[in-house]
Amino acid sequence: METMARDRARLIADIEAFEPFNEQESVDKQVILRALKSDPNCFERSAQAHMATSIWTVDASFERTLLEWHNIYQSWSWIGGHADGVADLRAVALREL
């Protein structure tokens, strides 16, 4: 199985195994699964429902966190970014870090 298909299948399995905390998470889970299963371009930011990542980074004591300035929103934010054609979202998150 090619890398993109393998990463997509792994992501689908991980999200299917996710237990939503509330109704909103249940809805979000279905939206994400629908995009992953039906849109071959869901890893491109041009897709209406596209994949992106976020990382919440803390130090070993959990007392400090790493944030970045978000120019569009003019505020501090956790780190993240669009997949831009990469289905391995862990790799995308690490790229942003």
Question: Where are the regions a protein language model picked out?
Answer:
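N-terminal leader/capping segments at the start of a protein or of a new domain
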Residues: M1-F21
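Acidic, metal-coordinating catalytic segment for phosphate/diphosphate chemistry
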Residues: D14-S54
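Short, well-ordered loop/turn elements at secondary-structure boundaries
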Residues: M51, S61-F62
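Conserved Nudix-box catalytic region and its N-terminal flanking loop in Nudix hydrolases
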Residues: F62-E96
